[in-house]
Protein backbone atom coordinates (compact mmCIF):
# COMPACT_ATOMS: atom_id res chain seq x y z
CA UNK A 1 0.00 0.00 0.00
CA UNK A 2 2.90 2.37 0.69
CA UNK A 3 4.48 1.82 -2.73
CA UNK A 4 1.52 3.18 -4.79
CA UNK A 5 1.42 6.30 -2.60
CA UNK A 6 5.16 6.75 -3.15
CA UNK A 7 4.73 6.38 -6.91
CA UNK A 8 1.91 8.92 -6.91
CA UNK A 9 4.06 11.40 -4.99
CA UNK A 10 6.96 10.74 -7.34
CA UNK A 11 4.75 11.41 -10.37
CA UNK A 12 3.48 14.63 -8.82
CA UNK A 13 7.03 15.72 -8.03
CA UNK A 14 7.90 15.41 -11.72
CA UNK A 15 4.90 17.48 -12.83
CA UNK A 16 4.85 21.21 -13.45
CA UNK A 17 2.14 23.80 -13.81
CA UNK A 18 3.48 26.61 -15.99
CA UNK A 19 2.53 30.25 -15.76
CA UNK A 20 1.11 31.59 -19.03
CA UNK A 21 4.13 33.69 -20.06
CA UNK A 22 6.58 31.09 -18.83
CA UNK A 23 4.88 28.53 -21.08
CA UNK A 24 4.81 30.94 -24.01
CA UNK A 25 8.57 31.47 -23.65
CA UNK A 26 9.21 27.71 -23.55
CA UNK A 27 7.11 27.17 -26.66
CA UNK A 28 8.87 29.99 -28.50
CA UNK A 29 12.30 28.66 -27.52
CA UNK A 30 11.30 25.20 -28.81
CA UNK A 31 10.32 26.52 -32.23
CA UNK A 32 6.55 26.35 -31.85
CA UNK A 33 5.81 29.95 -32.93
CA UNK A 34 4.78 29.57 -36.56
CA UNK A 35 5.32 25.81 -36.63
CA UNK A 36 3.16 24.53 -39.51
CA UNK A 37 1.63 28.01 -39.63
CA UNK A 38 0.34 27.82 -36.05
CA UNK A 39 0.89 30.93 -33.97
CA UNK A 40 2.38 30.98 -30.50
CA UNK A 41 -0.92 32.37 -29.20
CA UNK A 42 -2.76 29.36 -30.65
CA UNK A 43 -0.46 26.96 -28.78
CA UNK A 44 -0.83 28.88 -25.52
CA UNK A 45 -4.62 29.04 -25.90
CA UNK A 46 -4.80 25.32 -26.68
CA UNK A 47 -2.71 24.44 -23.62
CA UNK A 48 -4.75 26.71 -21.36
CA UNK A 49 -8.03 25.04 -22.29
CA UNK A 50 -6.68 21.48 -22.49
CA UNK A 51 -4.67 21.35 -19.26
CA UNK A 52 -4.45 24.74 -17.55
CA UNK A 53 -0.72 24.50 -18.43
CA UNK A 54 -0.36 21.40 -16.22
CA UNK A 55 2.09 18.75 -17.40
CA UNK A 56 0.43 16.14 -15.17
CA UNK A 57 -3.11 16.66 -16.49
CA UNK A 58 -5.09 13.54 -17.32
CA UNK A 59 -8.58 13.06 -18.72
CA UNK A 60 -10.45 9.80 -19.27
CA UNK A 61 -12.68 9.69 -22.35
CA UNK A 62 -15.91 7.77 -22.88
CA UNK A 63 -14.29 5.63 -25.61
CA UNK A 64 -11.81 4.21 -23.08
CA UNK A 65 -8.90 6.34 -24.25
CA UNK A 66 -7.08 8.82 -22.05
CA UNK A 67 -5.61 12.27 -22.75
CA UNK A 68 -2.22 13.02 -21.18
CA UNK A 69 -0.10 16.01 -20.29
CA UNK A 70 -0.04 19.69 -21.07
CA UNK A 71 -1.40 19.15 -24.61
CA UNK A 72 -3.80 16.33 -23.57
CA UNK A 73 -2.46 13.94 -26.16
CA UNK A 74 -4.72 10.94 -26.74
CA UNK A 75 -3.72 7.35 -26.04
CA UNK A 76 -5.79 5.85 -28.87
CA UNK A 77 -3.80 7.66 -31.56
CA UNK A 78 -0.57 9.15 -30.28
CA UNK A 79 0.91 7.34 -27.27
CA UNK A 80 0.83 3.95 -25.54
CA UNK A 81 -0.54 3.60 -22.01
CA UNK A 82 -0.87 -0.21 -22.19
CA UNK A 83 -4.61 0.10 -21.55
CA UNK A 84 -6.18 0.14 -25.02
CA UNK A 85 -5.13 -0.68 -28.58
CA UNK A 86 -3.23 2.30 -29.95
CA UNK A 87 -1.77 3.60 -33.17
CA UNK A 88 1.01 5.21 -31.05
CA UNK A 89 1.94 7.58 -33.87
CA UNK A 90 4.39 9.46 -31.62
CA UNK A 91 6.04 6.14 -30.63
CA UNK A 92 6.10 7.00 -26.92
CA UNK A 93 4.74 5.87 -23.58
CA UNK A 94 1.95 8.19 -22.46
CA UNK A 95 3.66 8.67 -19.10
CA UNK A 96 6.46 10.53 -20.94
CA UNK A 97 3.91 13.29 -21.60
CA UNK A 98 3.44 13.96 -17.88
CA UNK A 99 6.86 15.17 -16.78
CA UNK A 100 8.23 18.65 -16.26
CA UNK A 101 10.57 18.06 -19.22
CA UNK A 102 8.18 19.00 -22.02
CA UNK A 103 10.46 17.91 -24.87
CA UNK A 104 8.51 14.71 -25.59
CA UNK A 105 5.15 16.51 -25.33
CA UNK A 106 6.25 19.25 -27.74
CA UNK A 107 7.69 16.75 -30.23
CA UNK A 108 4.47 14.74 -30.13
CA UNK A 109 2.34 17.88 -30.56
CA UNK A 110 4.44 18.66 -33.64
CA UNK A 111 3.66 15.16 -34.91
CA UNK A 112 -0.08 15.65 -34.27
CA UNK A 113 -0.23 18.85 -36.32
CA UNK A 114 1.68 17.23 -39.17
CA UNK A 115 -1.45 15.17 -39.92
CA UNK A 116 -4.08 16.67 -42.25
CA UNK A 117 -6.33 17.67 -39.36
CA UNK A 118 -3.56 19.86 -37.94
CA UNK A 119 -4.38 21.82 -34.81
CA UNK A 120 -8.06 21.04 -35.37
CA UNK A 121 -7.31 17.63 -33.82
CA UNK A 122 -7.77 19.33 -30.44
CA UNK A 123 -11.41 19.87 -29.43
CA UNK A 124 -10.43 22.64 -27.00
CA UNK A 125 -8.75 24.61 -29.79
CA UNK A 126 -11.87 24.32 -31.95
CA UNK A 127 -14.13 25.43 -29.09
CA UNK A 128 -12.05 28.15 -27.47
CA UNK A 129 -9.34 29.38 -29.84
CA UNK A 130 -10.34 29.03 -33.49
CA UNK A 131 -11.29 32.31 -35.21
CA UNK A 132 -10.77 34.36 -32.03
CA UNK A 133 -8.48 37.19 -31.02
CA UNK A 134 -5.80 35.32 -29.09
CA UNK A 135 -3.49 38.26 -28.43
CA UNK A 136 -4.27 38.14 -24.69
CA UNK A 137 -2.57 34.75 -24.44
CA UNK A 138 0.84 36.25 -25.12
CA UNK A 139 0.20 39.83 -23.98
CA UNK A 140 2.70 41.12 -21.45
CA UNK A 141 5.09 38.24 -22.06
CA UNK A 142 7.72 40.33 -23.83
CA UNK A 143 7.74 38.08 -26.88
From Swiss-Prot:
Assembly and oligomerization: Monomer.
Upper lineage: Eukaryota, Metazoa, Chordata, Craniata, Vertebrata
Domain of life: Eukaryota
Reaction catalysis annotation: Hydrolysis of (1->4)-beta-linkages between N-acetylmuramic acid and N-acetyl-D-glucosamine residues in a peptidoglycan and between N-acetyl-D-glucosamine residues in chitodextrins
EC number assigned by the record: 3.2.1.17
Full protein name: Lysozyme C
Classification via CDD domains: LYZ_C
Similarity field: Belongs to the glycosyl hydrolase 22 family.
Primary location: secreted
Residues annotated as the enzyme's active site: 50, 67
Entry function: Lysozymes have primarily a bacteriolytic function; those in tissues and body fluids are associated with the monocyte-macrophage system and enhance the activity of immunoagents.
Any matching Pfam family: Lys
